[in-house]
């Protein structure tokens, strides 16, 4: 077992840094070493779909060469003896060039005892058999699924079939592969390009959303575009939501917010009010009191809606478009308070 680091993420190097720091501190405290499984990345389609649905940038690198370069960059640091002792390395790859590089580098650095090769059962079996004959420690793994989750196995199979038949994938070209052929030279050039790039590859993540920053209003546009969801994987957004908790968590000594009733352009605080209690505090703290309309006020609201004194019915489509954008931007500015209000009133 090990903690996976996926090289197709630009910030994978930073994840490795966190693991190294934790593993070294753990060993210094008398604990056992950890293990990092280094993979290229296996959820590209899912990452792409989720990013599209949530309005986020795609988090993965844009080319296979960049992914391979990042893999080699992380691998080199992982195999340094002072790192490999604390954080053992599982080199998960079916690429002969990557495997050979890891094999030679680990022996050059003297860290081979802390490294294993990992391969999927049933894929490139001749490669792991050859490695075993060389005395390498090879771990074979296979997905396991219960009968009731068989659809997950089907989706996994389809994903692997798609991945392993991609034009740039090593396994696509691995059958009857021989040194000196055009296919061999193509794969060799792939590896050499990645090797040249490994020391200049950047580690800047594509997702930099920061809800702590002031909201930037969105100008009107002809095409509707949803506001991106909050990415709670990001540390700054986690801090933002903790601040919301702190702001909206009332104590019994705090006075509740008084919510007025709106009648047309006027607001009225009614004598009759409904109390909303904080569900997260066992309904012991009142968050707000909502004004409740009487029969006369309800009739006045209906009259205003019927007569339309503000002239809403006469506004043009362009005017409504502008107003709706202003309302959307205002909601964006108040996002934190809206979430805080919901957290206070809705049990979680």
Kindly give the residue locations of the regions a language model identified.
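Positively charged, amphipathic and often flexible ligand-engagement surfaces
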Residues: 1-222
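Conserved helicase NTPase catalytic core signature
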Residues: 343
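Conserved small/polar residues in nucleotide/adenosyl-binding loops
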Residues: 347-348
